[in-house]
């Protein structure tokens, strides 16, 4: 296990292991003691104290944003591996594992295929001579093994492509089934509504018949009630008559005749009533009512059919061209969404530079001047604007007069002919970053094949470089005409010298860094780059091109590290997701944080201020025009927002 670890050991890897990724200071056994979070990342104790002081329920890891719920640093364990590497004796032992497996004193140059050992030249000549042993240089053996792995990787990628096609076909089948389910359910609903209409008509007829019976019976009952009331009145009248007789004198009562007949009051009342009785006679269904039944029948679907693939349609919008505006300060009107920067914290400048909103250029679409998820922005010294339009697979070039042209991948050669003949899709240009040097060459990092491509302004590709690049991302142009490219997975910054006729003529490693991504440079050739992976917490579509860094480093043209801006650039402020940078004429650094949705300003002399804090959705690129206007590329708004930027002196803390 130690030998396997030592095979990948180098000075850059040791520096990455022995430095805190936040403050970029080397770990020590005291104040900068390495502490291990629950997610597995290592941070020094000093940075953890700041993280713990600025949170309530724990520490949020700047790498993966997972929360380690602790109340004290004593609850975290030390990274014993890092502490062991700090020991000089242990480090010497690890370096010794990189030597010849036979003598252990010299660097290996040969590889014995028979024994599986890396050997130095004297050991090979002494003990590993043919025919008993087959030896070859280490580089050739490694390249041979890489080719074997590459063939296996190619087969696996073909298999992955086939699996993706089958998954897409299966998704199409699933959507078709869902549509069929919905259609059958709608048909059932129509039939159910028809039955409900029939039931409503039946209920109306039934209630009408019941109302007729109720009316007839009511008439009989009312007539009988009328006769009873008359008889009751007659009875009351007779009662009053007899009461009066009872009160008469004896002589008068006896003198009246007593043979008066008593009237029959109930003679007119009927003895029987003829009414209509009702009852419910059930007709039709004997069992429960059923509208219909779902009938199943077998259906065979070929998952390799092309009909199962989901087709996408893009809506075209009106074209909007970019035109740089010439406006006086009196004509500038601030947008209600873009307010001047306010002071934030005790470290903010007292006289803060104001950036007023001027205009928004472009919208979502595929026509010239429109954008679809733009990810990179670059402005040349002549005022030309280059935009990496990732969603439309192109680079758009604008001049001060408006849209100039677009650059796409123009396939040529026998491979493209074969792909076209077979009906396969041609490779696209998937730009991640773009820049133009002083020679008029346009450098683009392409995520389609993880390469650096260099184009002329006419769209002709003069170079395509993949060697030494694992995942190229950011690119910038030095004043000398060289391109600097960041390799996120390789952890290096590469410097390329490109010739218009010969392509890439020279390349070298400028420096190493922790997952460098976005890059820019000033007029003196100092390169600024982001480090680490800060996740945008509002990345709703899981788009990895919207993830940025959480600290900034710099390196000179000679490879010497310079100014560093750590994760905590202020006492109470930190980076969340750096997605773009640029440098103004004074050497001040301007940073776009897509998670904070703000544009930050870091003067060369120190301090910071917030230039723009409102009106941005997801800023991913910024650049300054020669006329002093600040261009902000808003990815989720699919446009360029233009602000005023005045170069004036002000004091910083």
Curated annotation (Swiss-Prot):
Domain of life of the organism encoding this protein: Eukaryota
Modification after translation (UniProt): Ubiquitinated.
Disease linked to the protein: Muscular dystrophy, limb-girdle, autosomal recessive 8: An autosomal recessive degenerative myopathy characterized by pelvic girdle, shoulder girdle and quadriceps muscle weakness. Clinical phenotype and severity are highly variable. Disease progression is slow and most patients remain ambulatory into the sixth decade of life. Bardet-Biedl syndrome 11: A syndrome characterized by usually severe pigmentary retinopathy, early-onset obesity, polydactyly, hypogenitalism, renal malformation and intellectual disability. Secondary features include diabetes mellitus, hypertension and congenital heart disease. Bardet-Biedl syndrome inheritance is autosomal recessive, but three mutated alleles (two at one locus, and a third at a second locus) may be required for clinical manifestation of some forms of the disease.
Coiled coil: 138-197
Result after altering residue 55 to D: Decreases the apoptotic cell death induced by glucose starvation
Listed pathway(s): Protein modification; protein ubiquitination
Residues found modified as N-acetylalanine: 2
GO BP terms in the entry: actin ubiquitination; autophagosome assembly; axon development; cellular response to amino acid starvation; cellular response to stress; fat cell differentiation; free ubiquitin chain polymerization; innate immune response
Protein name: E3 ubiquitin-protein ligase TRIM32
Tissue expression: Spleen, thymus, prostate, testis, ovary, intestine, colon and skeletal muscle.
Compartments reported by the entry: Cytoplasm; Mitochondrion; Endoplasmic reticulum
Chief localization: cytoplasm
Family, as annotated: Belongs to the TRIM/RBCC family.
Reaction equations catalysed: S-ubiquitinyl-[E2 ubiquitin-conjugating enzyme]-L-cysteine + [acceptor protein]-L-lysine = [E2 ubiquitin-conjugating enzyme]-L-cysteine + N(6)-ubiquitinyl-[acceptor protein]-L-lysine
Designated gene of the protein: TRIM32
Modified residues (Phosphoserine): 55, 328, 335, 339
Pfam families linked to this entry: NHL (PF01436), zf-RING_UBOX (PF13445)
Cross-referenced InterPro entries: 6-blade_b-propeller_TolB-like (IPR011042), NHL_repeat (IPR001258), TRIM32_Bbox1_Znf (IPR047051), Znf-RING_euk (IPR027370), Znf_B-box (IPR000315), Znf_RING (IPR001841), Znf_RING/FYVE/PHD (IPR013083), Znf_RING_CS (IPR017907)
Cellular component, GO annotation: autophagosome; centrosome; cytoplasm; cytosol; endoplasmic reticulum; mitochondrion; nucleus; striated muscle myosin thick filament
NHL repeat residues: 358-401, 415-458, 459-499, 562-605, 606-646
GO molecular function, one term: ubiquitin protein ligase activity
Naturally occurring in which organism (per UniProt): Homo sapiens (Human)
Keyword Zinc among record annotations: yes
